[in-house]
């Protein structure tokens, strides 16, 4: 299946507590990878418009960890995790936890596919520990955050 450049597809698997996100970008894998691994770029696009973001720690290497906080007038929303595998321009495997629900840990895998002509297909999967956790994740506004975040990433990649 091929998605259009601006379409973000978010699919919940009916058989396992997994969410799959697919998006294409008008940039080569090296540039998309850097935007995911350089904290100075990441802070410019991750999450929905209207939230401020700060990165408390970010060590993108196998065994490294991260913590970042989104904030708005209603409060702060902190996230953290550990990197398990990082392959430049190809793959990132990490855990992901929303600190407001620390028992809900997801295993995330981000794969970058070179489509040629300076384009990349990103496929991200998040395997959550339960259907309840996955459904709460989806109901949390995650779709808005992902779609708006990738729109913001388009802007960063165009620079």
Where are each of the predicted segments found?
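Hydrophobic ligand-binding cavity/cleft-lining segments
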Residues: 1-52
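Beta-strand/loop substructures that line and gate deep hydrophobic ligand-binding cavities in soluble
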Residues: 18, 93-147
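Intrinsic-disorder/low-complexity, polar/charged segments enriched in Ser/Thr/Lys/Arg/Asp/Glu/Gln
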Residues: 18-22, 29, 53, 65, ...
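Short beta-edge strand/loop motif at the mouth of beta-sheet-based domains
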Residues: 20-21, 40-76
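Hydrophobic/aromatic beta-strand elements that line small-molecule binding cavities or substrate pockets
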Residues: 22-23, 55-58, 79-85, 96, ...
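Hydrophobic pocket/interface hotspot
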Residues: 32, 42, 66, 83, ...
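Generic C-terminal helix-cap and adjacent flexible tail
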Residues: 155-159
């Amino acid at each position: 299946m091929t998605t259009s450049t601006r379409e973000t597809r978010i699919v919940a698997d009916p058989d396992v507590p997994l969410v799959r996100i697919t998006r294409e970008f008008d940039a080569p894998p090296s540039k998309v990878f850097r935007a995911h691994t350089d904290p100075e770029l990441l802070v410019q696009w991750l999450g929905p418009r209207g939230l401020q973001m700060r990165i408390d720690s970010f060590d993108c290497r196998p065994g490294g960890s991260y913590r970042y906080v989104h904030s708005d007038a209603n409060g702060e929303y902190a996230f953290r995790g550990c990197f398990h595998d990082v392959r430049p321009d190809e793959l990132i495997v990490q855990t992901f936890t929303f600190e407001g629900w620390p028992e809900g840990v997801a295993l995330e895998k981000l794969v970058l596919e070179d489509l040629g002509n300076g384009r990349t297909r990103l496929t991200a999967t998040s395997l959550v520990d339960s259907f309840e956790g996955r459904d709460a994740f989806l109901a949390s506004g995650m779709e808005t955050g992902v779609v708006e975040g990738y729109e913001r990433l388009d802007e960063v990649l165009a620079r």
